[in-house]
Amino acid sequence: MDGFCRPIGQKGAPMYAVLKSFGLKGLNGFPVEVEADISGGMPALSIVGLPDSAVRESGDRVHAALKNLGFKWPDRRITINLAPADVRKTGPVYDLPLLLAVLAASGQLEPPPKDTAFLGELALDGSLRPVSGVLPMALEAAAGGVRALYVPAENAAEAAEACGSEMQVYPAATARQVVDALRGVQPILPTIPVPFDPADAWSHVPDFADVCGQPLARRLPGILPPLTREEAVETTKIYSIAGQMPAGRGLVTARPFRSPHHSASSAALAGGGAQFRPGECSLANCGVLFLDELPEFSRESLEVLRQPLEDGCITVSRAAGSATYPSRFQLVAAMNPCKCGYYGHPTRACTCSPSAVRQYRSRVSGPLLDRIDLCVEMDPVAFDELHGAAPSESSAELRKQVLAARAIQAQRYAAPGYEDVRCNAQLTAGQVRRICRMTPAAEQLLRASYETLGLSARAHDRILRVARTIADLSGKRLLDEDSLLEALQYRAQEKVDLTF
């Protein structure tokens, strides 16, 4: 038999069924076999295989849904095993396969084929509710040879993005629809994947042409290149696991913009929790993470940023295990010069003492400042600038310049040895020295600056990456003095005197 073996030759003989489902571990899915065994004894339901509370409660949901759909609940002892038994199972994703396994083991449903899998949460009336993390589980299903995947209707567009030439995704609003489809009574039409098109990725982003004293950070995604399909899949996996995918949505096509409040904890930024959910650093992957009032964040929260800024990923470790999430984002931070906000203001007097200013600025550690490439001091906007300023360059015009520079970098990093590099920011220390070639005058300037400013090795490499990007925007092959001076100017703010 395809999906189960059911020896029922004698009264009281055990009945058994097994169905295929999937779970989540970190950013990826893993296969789970849902086994149902019905045997003699006092009526009872037992779920084993390291289930969490949501999985243990699924027995009550399945019992109610099965009865409300008109099926018979077996009046015997039922044991459900979720294999592999040494991996913790979380969430309500196993409700649908659990119900079908009970029906199959009790002889009310013929066994589904081995290459069929099921995901979905049950309501008490038998309707299906969407679940988190469908895309990574669907990708694992497609890679594991599954040909038919049944999911809640609201998850179908997302799951269909994992479809290849072999696997089909079938949307269902109720468990009854799944049963009828398996019986051949009422087939379900598969969901057709929507072609990937990031053309509208900038439609919701404010334009740079309107900027005059208004927030710049929120406009930054509007000048970044569109997401590649690989980046879109990775970003969608993160949002799906975090439960932040809109219903009926396929892939995320716009670069994320995240702006957490300064009261956010380190766990909110890094991620984690009982079920290992991505934090703000991962939700900003391939996009922008904006931290306003930077010194107001707790020291513990700010230090969380070190690993993702350096490695492009973040590892969350808890007693239940560990998970690594991609966290390659552009960090944009803003802060006042002091607590009252008027230190150095041309017309307003600062009310802070020197020690208060020193204490306020010291909340941002040196190692974190060392990882910030561009530091710019913003002056107050005058009245005449607000009312008489000429329009700024539009986001579309700026985007053309960015895309031209990215095209240069794409051609450069198409060479062997740069498979993991898409742009200058991703260069390793060794690659920086090979790629960032300088004129003799520029090299002499960098040597003098390194010794005079006491730069770290990390700052040295970051200056070269920024200078290389400035040169790309200008179409220069070698780093000259102008490119290097501009990059050094952006680093000058890290030498702001914090001790007076």
Can you say where each PLM-predicted feature lies in the sequence?
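Peripheral, non-AAA+ core regions of ATP-driven protein-machinery
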Residues: D2-P215, H460, R477-F500
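Short beta-strand elements
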Residues: V32-I38, L269, D373-E377
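Basic, amphipathic alpha-helical bundle interface domains used for macromolecular binding and assembly
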Residues: A54-G59, K72-P74, N81-G91, F276, ...
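Alpha-helical scaffold elements adjacent to nucleotide-binding pockets in ATP/GTP-utilizing enzyme cores
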Residues: R61, A65, L98-A101, M137-E140, ...
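Short glycine-centered helix-capping/turn motifs at secondary-structure transition points
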Residues: S106-Q108, G184, G243, G312, ...
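Proline-centered turn/helix-capping motifs that create local helix->coil transitions or kinks
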Residues: E110-P111, D180-P193, T228-R229, I241-A247, ...
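Short hydrophobic alpha-helical runs that function as membrane-insertion/retention elements
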Residues: R147-P152, Q168-A172, P226, L289-L291, ...
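Conserved ASCE/P-loop NTPase catalytic core
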Residues: L216-S362
